[in-house]
Amino acid sequence: KNGWTCLVVADCTGHGIPGAFMTLISSTLLDRISSIKDLSHPDTILNDLDEFLQKSLSLDDTHQETDFGLDAGVCCFSLDAKIFRYSGAKMNLYQKTDQGVVEIKGDKKSLGYDIKEHPLNFKVFECALNEKPSSFFVFSDGVTDQVGGEKKLMYGKKRVLHQIREAVDVKAAVNNIVADVERYQGVNKRRDDLTLFGFAL
């Protein structure tokens, strides 16, 4: 829209029906936001999504907390303007360059769940898109929190970042992470959905 592309990675509350319910609502609201709002500011998109969620879940009427909500990361970029922006609601971004992997932390607040004062004032990370491409990765805590190994510990962020650093490209990184998490999990129960998104610009 107007030369800007928006990518959203979201991790909704719950499993089964509650998770599907939040996924459907959030997807519908994001479609609405994309049709009526500017797509160049990820912080505004997160703020608008939280406002619409409050109305959809009737939080502004009941003033009560709910178990329905989500964590999300929003990437906005323009190939014409050569600008990339990111804002996160309890979700971080990882940028791989020739110098290594850099963690861009999102804000420590989720969307939904309870009534909030707006605007939420999410931080915005911005960088220029150079001729030499960068790789970007966003993933949910289902990846890092998977229990496995001999000591039945969580997979952890360090293992994810190791796979990103060692991979030759984005596709290899994603495939290697998924395969390594499954290997690490072994016979242990899957704790959560695995959401992992990588792309190069």
What residue spans do the PLM features occupy?
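Sensory beta-strand/linker motifs that couple input domains to effectors
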Residues: 8
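Active-site-proximal, acidic helix/loop segment immediately C-terminal to a metal-coordinating Asp/Glu
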Residues: 16-40, 102, 130-188
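Residues that scaffold the ATP/ADP-binding catalytic core of kinase and kinase-like folds
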Residues: 96, 114, 146-147
